[in-house]
Amino acid sequence: FAFSNRLSTTIFYASSVLIFFIFYGIFIYLGTKKKINLKEIFILLGMTAAILVLSYPAILSYDIFNYVATSKVLFFYHENPYVIMPIEFIGDPLLAFTHAANKIALYAPFWLLLTGIPYLLGLGNFIVILFSFKLFSILFYLGSAFLIWKISRNVLSLILFSFNPLIVIETLVSGHNDIAMIFLALFSFFLLS
């Protein structure tokens, strides 16, 4: 659809980003004027996550499919994803979704072990696995928001991170793993404080 309807896709994308920035500005305003409290922020975060978990991650990136494929190499085929590429499993239906099937694992072993959680929770069903990975990203997002609050005790800091359109789109829509690294960094700061 996107390639054959570029104008519609562009308008939809630009409108979506504009809406994210409008809400971001509203939340920042409410935070600076102290017209929004912590409970309301976390309710809004939960609602945002609940809505965007249903968004299709390949709108902007195919990375989540690559995470699934790498996990499948390790946890389904029981092969070393640092040696064996997903493309070597000819006929695997997941290959139709990945755009980096010709690459070995790109991330550290700890990330691969973490991806075993959503992969195994998916019980071999592609759709369930995909949404398990998105839910995994959401948990790291909510955990990061919580840690920012615990570290800063500042509502505006929480808003600046949690409703940032880049964070929201890349985490809740695309399901990128950067949020896991953010969470772990924040967790280390939390332990130091």
Where are these regions (language model features)?
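Transmembrane-helix motifs of polytopic, lipid-linked glycan transferases
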Residues: 21-31, 131-155, 182-183
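Specific aromatic-rich, kink-prone transmembrane helix
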Residues: 143-147, 169, 180-193
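Aromatic- and kink-enriched transmembrane "portal" helix at the membrane-lumen/periplasm boundary
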Residues: 54, 125-130, 134, 141, ...
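Membrane-water interface at transmembrane helix exits
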Residues: 32, 56, 115, 119, ...
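Start-transfer (signal-anchor) and selected internal transmembrane alpha helices
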Residues: 1-55
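Intramembrane catalytic core of multi-pass membrane enzymes that act on lipidic substrates
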Residues: 41-132
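Hydrophobic, membrane-inserted alpha-helices
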Residues: 46-50, 164-166, 185-187
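Transmembrane-helix signature of polytopic, membrane-embedded enzymes
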Residues: 36-41, 145-167
